[in-house]
């Protein structure tokens, strides 16, 4: 189990390689990263026994930016028939697991394998339980089987509390029919990723106040209104009429970069299409000056050196807050609903 498999958005394999290689170097885990363009995954091949396990134990998956999911393990070739027997034999050297996910890569080939995985899961689960390789009442790791085809699978494991919240890191969020744009799912996914579900009722409570910069037509505003948060929607464009009729939205026709609330708010959110450095500076200002307690801001990415640029901007935000003497948690993730962008979350401590 000396290979670390990392899922990602197609086209961002290079960013995953750069990110995991940097962490491995810091942790002194020898190895190398490799990936094929648009394959929706990357691999880190460890040069020493136990390297992949050390990486996963020393890193928090939630702190990684570009990987959607990860697992340590090995590739296994499967026959056309009796795949289960071959899998069971291979798993003899693996720990007993407490959950099972069958995964595919986020490619056209991967999507075509989804039906196979759905049909294969029930008989496989039954066989694993019968063979004592799966104990769903136990405390073992999660068994993650990533199928590249019906004949090739990556047999991996990961701790359930240190890996993706959803299979392949892809959330199953339903688009709310009342929301004025599909961008609404970005903010909902961000909340799932950055805020533990048990804290939603206190950190996203009814009666709180929020500002949505670049709000029109109101996709992100809708998420706050849906939780009965009072919103100042800032945009020169028109807002959705139903949102305005909710009584929870005040529309300010103003520039999102110059707008300031009359008093501090609980939340600031921003999905303005602008140079990432400008959005990062806006984020630092709002948290640094105490204009809000928490913020979610999207940073659009350049065409090249994307990981290096994100890292530079996060360091600039951290340095700026340190100079102000402000303590804050800083999180960053390329969410499933993000495209050429990442989502940053800051919380003033």
Swiss-Prot record:
Q: Which domain of life is it from?
A: Bacteria
| Binding sites annotated in the UniProt record for S-adenosyl-L-methionine | 183, 216-219, 235, 255, 271
Q: Which reaction does it catalyse?
A: cytidine(2498) in 23S rRNA + S-adenosyl-L-methionine = 2'-O-methylcytidine(2498) in 23S rRNA + S-adenosyl-L-homocysteine + H(+)
Task: Write down the SUPFAM superfamilies for this protein, in alphabetical order.
Answer: S-adenosyl-L-methionine-dependent methyltransferases
Which residues does the Swiss-Prot or TrEMBL record annotate as the active site?
A: 300
UniProt keyword annotations, A-Z = Cytoplasm, Methyltransferase, rRNA processing, S-adenosyl-L-methionine, Transferase
Q: Which GO terms describe its cellular component?
A: cytoplasm
Compartmental location: Cytoplasm
One GO BP on record is:
methylation
What Gene3D superfamilies does this protein's entry cite?
3.30.2300.20, 3.30.70.2810, Vaccinia Virus protein VP39 (3.40.50.150)
Gene Ontology MF: a single term: S-adenosylmethionine-dependent methyltransferase activity
Q: Give the EC class as a word.
A: transferase
- Keyword Lipid metabolism, does the record have it? no
Using the UniProt record, give the first listed, main subcellular location: cytoplasm
Question: What Enzyme Commission number(s) appear in the record?
Answer: 2.1.1.186
Extract the Pfam families matched here. FtsJ, RlmM_FDX, RLMM_N
Function noted in UniProt: Catalyzes the 2'-O-methylation at nucleotide C2498 in 23S rRNA.
What is its quaternary makeup?
Monomer.
The record's family statement is: Belongs to the class I-like SAM-binding methyltransferase superfamily. RNA methyltransferase RlmE family. RlmM subfamily.
Output this protein's name.
Ribosomal RNA large subunit methyltransferase M
Q: What organism is listed for this UniProt entry? A: Stutzerimonas stutzeri (strain A1501) (Pseudomonas stutzeri)
* Gene that this polypeptide is encoded by: rlmM
């Amino acid at each position: 189990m000396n290979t670390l498999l990392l899922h990602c958005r197609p086209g961002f394999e290079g960013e995953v390689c750069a990110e995991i290689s940097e962490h491995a170097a810091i942790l002194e885990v020898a190895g190398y990263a490799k990936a094929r363009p648009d394959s929706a995954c990357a691999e880190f091949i460890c040069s020493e026994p136990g390297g992949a396990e050390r990486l996963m134990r020393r890193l928090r998956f939630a702190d990684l930016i570009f990987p959607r999911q990860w697992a340590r393990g090995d590739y296994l070739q499967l026959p056309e028939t009796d795949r289960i027997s071959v899998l069971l034999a291979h798993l003899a050297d693996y720990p007993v697991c407490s959950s099972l996910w069958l995964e595919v890569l986020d490619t056209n080939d991967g999507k075509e394998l989804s039906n196979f995985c759905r049909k294969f899961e029930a008989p496989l689960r039954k066989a694993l339980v019968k063979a004592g390789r799966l104990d769903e009442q136990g405390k073992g790791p999660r068994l993650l089987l990533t199928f590249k085809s019906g004949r090739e699978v990556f047999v991996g494991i990961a701790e359930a509390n240190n890996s993706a919240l959803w299979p392949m890191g892809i959330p199953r969020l339903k688009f709310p029919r009342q929301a004025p744009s599909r961008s609404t799912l970005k903010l909902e996914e961000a909340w799932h990723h950055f805020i533990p579900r048990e804290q939603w009722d206190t950190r996203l409570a009814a009666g709180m106040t929020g500002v949505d910069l670049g709000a029109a037509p109101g996709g992100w505003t809708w998420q706050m209104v849906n939780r009965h948060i009072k919103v100042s929607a800032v945009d020169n464009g028109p807002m959705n009429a139903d949102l305005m009729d909710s009584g929870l939205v005040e529309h300010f026709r103003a520039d999102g970069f110059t707008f300031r609330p009359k008093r501090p708010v609980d939340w600031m959110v921003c999905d303005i299409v602008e140079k990432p450095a400008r959005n990062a500076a806006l984020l630092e200002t709002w948290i640094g000056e105490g204009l809000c307690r928490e913020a979610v801001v999207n940073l659009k990415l350049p065409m090249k050196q994307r990981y290096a640029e994100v890292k530079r901007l996060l360091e600039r935000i951290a340095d700026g807050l340190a100079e102000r003497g402000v303590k804050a948690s800083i999180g960053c993730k390329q969410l499933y609903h993000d495209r050429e962008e990442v989502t940053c979350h800051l919380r003033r401590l």
